[in-house]
Amino acid sequence: MATHVIRTDWPHATSHATARRLSRALHFCTRHYLLLPLGAAIALVWANLAPFSYFTFGRVLAFPVNEIAMALVFGLIAQEVYEETAPGGALHQWRRWTVPMIAAASGVAAAAAAYGIYVEWKIETMLHVTWPVVAGVDVALVYFITKAIFQRPGGAAGARRSHPAIPFVLLLALAANVIGFIVIAPSYVVAAERTGGASVLMAAAIATAWWLRRHRVTEFWPYIWVAGGLSWTALYVEGFHPALALLPIVPFMPHARRPLDELFADDSDVRGRTVRHFEHLWHYHAQAALFLFGLVNAGVMLTGYGTGTWATLLAVVGGRTVGIVIGVWLAVAAGLHLPAALRMREVTVVALAASAGFTFSLFFATTLLPAGPLLAELKLGALLTPVGILLAWLAARLLRVGRFARHAHVHAYGKHRGA
């Protein structure tokens, strides 16, 4: 007689198999930096299919995601820039770190010119004063796409070397946003009674970070919670984005790089691990924050377009890209230097990546205009600027740079660093 075995563990086996598949899918998304575009795609579909529920959801999560969770992302961005401008970094010498500064100014100037020409052609004089919108660069989006293109997947987060394109474009993006903030400063009214208290808090934050560094505190928690908390509060009181709170704090955290004459010194001093430990521990949490960032901010109704929409898109994706490339070319011709592994083909990809205005362009637009049809046009244009990151990805494939480079060039950065 045949014996039939009845399995009683099949629900558990099925759940384990499903969990493994989900784990593999999540690992693939984090390894290839897909969580941000996934969140943005969900938001875009959701906003156009069920706008009421989406915008209700967005209002609830906007502040904790944009101003708290994103502080972690900007902290990692500051870490990238700080390490590469410190001794031993790809942008350490002034002849190198001034190049992205010049590129930022050139990009903003070209974008402003393109914006003004298009608006003049369309005879929309009311839009002339809104040109600072094209100065905004979404640092988080730029960080995501540049990391996805130039950072080879695999390996532990703390063990990876950054391609110099990453700190280059981040420094460029930060400089462009500083230009934008300076231009809109007269329009950005902050209550006078807030300014004094915020300045004291920021001074206390920087003093705390300096004291921690001076006393060789190697744990990053005091830097984040104490100094970072004071900085966050100062920016919140002042009315700026508190998500930028860690930008002035991370440079005080001990980092891993050393001057060449100290490379073979005693390694028992663990102070240099602080910044690297911070990146290693929070790398995947930052990707989760980017997913929520895309989910909360990328939903837009595909209506309300006009001259402001196309002027913003043309100026940012076209004008700024060309301006950055020209600025880098002029800087190099004047005797400044690109990092060893950065050539003009990489600069072209970086320039396209830097065309994503998104949240900073939205911020500048809402500062310059009251609610109305013109503001709606500009906001839609700002929300469409991430098309630049798609163009950057395609350009990287076409030009064979970053992860699309031939095998012989994939390790070029490591060779230059080791030289």
Place the predicted regions along the sequence by residue.
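Predominantly late transmembrane helices and immediately cytosolic-facing juxtamembrane segments
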Residues: T3-H32, V45-F55, A204-T208, H215, ...
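Interfacial loop-to-helix junctions that mark the boundaries of transmembrane helices
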Residues: R24-T30, F55-N66, W94-V99, E124-V133, ...
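Interfacial helix-loop-helix linkers and transmembrane-helix boundary segments
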Residues: L26, F57-G58, Y82-V99, W121-M126, ...
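Transmembrane alpha-helix boundary signature
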Residues: V45-F57, L76-H92, A109-W131, R152-P153
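Short helical (or helix-break) motifs at transmembrane helix termini and adjacent helical loops
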Residues: E80, A110-A111, V134-F168, A176-I182, ...
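Entry/N-cap segments of selected transmembrane alpha helices
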Residues: E84-G116, E193-A205, G304-T321, M344-A351, ...
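Hydrophobic alpha-helical transmembrane segments in multi-pass integral membrane proteins
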Residues: A111-G116, V183-S187, Y236-H241, F291-T303, ...
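Functional cores that coordinate and move charged inorganic groups
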Residues: F150-P254
